[in-house]
Amino acid sequence: RYIIVEPLSIKVSYEHSVRLPIARELLGNGTTIYANVALKPENSNNFNASLFGTWHPGNGHTFYYEMSGFFRKVDNYIQTSIAEKEGTMQYTNVPAVHVKGAEGEMRYDWQGRLQLATNVSYQDTRDQQKYKGDGKPSATYNNRVPNRPWLFGSVEAYYTFRNIALPESRLRLGCTYQWVHWYFLTWEAYGAYDNKARIPAQHICNADITYSWRRGRYNLALECTNFLDKTAYDNYKLQKPGRAFFAKFRLFIN
């Protein structure tokens, strides 16, 4: 890490990591996930570089930003293999995978009252195995690894009112927007392009309101997730619940 000037710093890092398969990946669940006791640990060499900083122009304004890029060379990448017709899956190893990507984030704060934030991520994860074990060319070479979002972002906005109804109280209003680009459920090399299973693009908006008093000892929160009731899916194209409401009360005891 090196500080170039006060609002601008640079950070470069390298790491070698090993990820062992978890129990579900090795043994399955007995119904929808098949066991694969031959699953190998995942090894990766990771290179990261980022620019970041905080700027205080005055009058209670604060800006924070970070831009980063990364490259990961992964051996025995663990991923899910989906059997669409059977509705089952199994964790398998992809012998060689390269992950290239970039991320950006910006945050703004005004006197602890107004907070704005946005971020976007791009992750290009591709199969790098040119030939199969029998020497034949691999059809999935340079394909994106399926069932994995590769472009997504979010926007957040919060505003806090102080001393509403009670002294030493705070009322915070918040709204968030999340976006995910569509991606393939299975390898893009298999089947006709127009008929491939895809997880469609998703646009989800959430809203919440939190009221706290007695210096945060008592907290009451109300939240509405997906308040526009848009269709949403998880990584396996299983539909998530639509609009939902939640209420929560917290009491801190010293």
Predicted segment positions?
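Outer-membrane beta-barrel translocator domains and adjoining extracellular loop/strand segments
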Residues: A23-G30, Y77-K85, Q123, D127-P137, ...
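Membrane-embedded beta-barrel scaffold of Gram-negative outer-membrane proteins
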Residues: S9-S13, P41-K100
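Signature of Gram-negative outer-membrane beta-barrel scaffolds
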Residues: R1-E6, L20, A117, K132
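Gram-negative outer-membrane beta-barrel transporters
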Residues: Y64-K73, T92-T186
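Conserved C-terminal beta-signal and adjacent last beta-strands/turns
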Residues: R1, L8, V12-S13, K40-N48, ...
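Extracellular loop and loop/strand-boundary signature of outer-membrane beta-barrel proteins
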Residues: T31-L39, G87-N93, G101-E103, D134-V145, ...
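Generic structural "secondary-structure junction" signal
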Residues: L20-N29, P41, N76, T80, ...
